[in-house]
Amino acid sequence: MSKKDYYEVLGLQKGASEQEIKRAYKRLAAKHHPDKNQGSKEAEEKFKEIKEAYEVLGDNEKRAMYDQYGHQAFEHGGGAGGFGGFGGGGFGGFEDIFSEMFGGGFGGGARRQRVVRGDDLRYDLEITLEEAVRGVKKDIRIRTLVQCDTCHGSGAEAGSKVETCPHCHGSGRVRRQQGFFMTETVCPSCHGTGKKIDKPCKSCHGDGRVEKTKNLSVTIPAGVDTGNQLRLSGEGAAGENGAPAGDLYVVIHVKDHDIFVRDGSNLYCEVPISFTMAALGGEIEVPTLDGRVKLKIPAETQTGKLFRVRGKGVTSARGGYAGDLICKVIIETPVSLNEEQKELLRKLEESLEGKGQHRPKHEGFFKGVKNFFDNLSK
């Protein structure tokens, strides 16, 4: 390890900002990189110094240790085996350093008991399109961890002694020095609880929490759509050691509808009409989520034509406006015709034969086909 002042190595003052440290490192590392200075031992050593300095100053925790104790902060405990938690002897000044940095984790005073917020939970809720559009209240059941009623979350039987774990001093975690770096793991003695219980509660086996089914009422606002999430604060799993519970996220899934397809705030549907109405025009009733409305079909309507019924879509969940209902006309071909009906259609067809103005798309299509093959033969 270099004994040079890390700030001097990077050409910085002690109060340099994180951005200044990062810029200095990038500039100097690029200048002294071995690939740019092949064969230069001096550049190689300089690059190592720069890298070492940045590994310390670029890490807020290591930088704080270095600012207070200099190189001494990293001179002890560097063996491959490290140390087994907080409490062992034989580390001299290194132990004192970490006691100050981490609140007495190596010997002296106890650290604050670990408090872990409960897990967030997810519940997938399926609702109908009508419920999504209008809003609805739903009752749901979830299986989750709740505070133990027997011990009130302490994890101990009544009158039982609860002590701070002597191995991790209540943190639930132990740190190990491995060479230049430090790792943190769950305390193997208390399994992360930070405490030692003389007589664990029989109901929760010392955890302070038990699994239970909860019944909840969820209010779904109008205008929600598939993928929307509702957060129920504090309805997730109970936290450890009396920590706050997590949240419950209700994820909305809207069922497919028999008539309507939703796209944002608009609703789409297909409306079948007879070919005579398409030719002559007329009026039909179309469904909406609020009932039926009348829709005028102009004469000479072609299949696939879209008609917009304004304001009959979905009101935005954020309020303010409603989408539209878009009706796509589908012209039905008559089926199960008797001979008399077929003869009438043949006469109609004969009366239209050769008159392109009655069938503009038909004539336009075959004219386009003829032009296509004429061009191929040239």
UniProtKB/Swiss-Prot annotation:
Any one biological process term the GO annotation gives: DNA replication
Protein name: Chaperone protein DnaJ
Sequence ranges assigned to domain J in this UniProt record: 5-70
Covalent S-S links between cysteines: none
HAMAP family reported for this sequence: DnaJ
Zinc finger regions, CR-type: 135-213
Superkingdom classification of source: Bacteria
Organism of origin: Glaesserella parasuis serovar 5 (strain SH0165) (Haemophilus parasuis)
Subcellular location: Cytoplasm
Pfam (any one): DnaJ_CXXCXGXG
Binding positions for Zn(2+) 2 per the UniProt entry: 165, 168, 187, 190
CXXCXGXG motif repeats: 148-155, 165-172, 187-194, 201-208
MF GO annotations: ATP binding; heat shock protein binding; unfolded protein binding; zinc ion binding
Cofactor binding: number and manner: Binds 2 Zn(2+) ions per monomer.
Assembly: Homodimer.
UniProt keyword annotation of Zinc present: yes
Binding positions (Zn(2+) 1): 148, 151, 201, 204
Assigned protein family: Belongs to the DnaJ family.
GO cellular component: cytoplasm
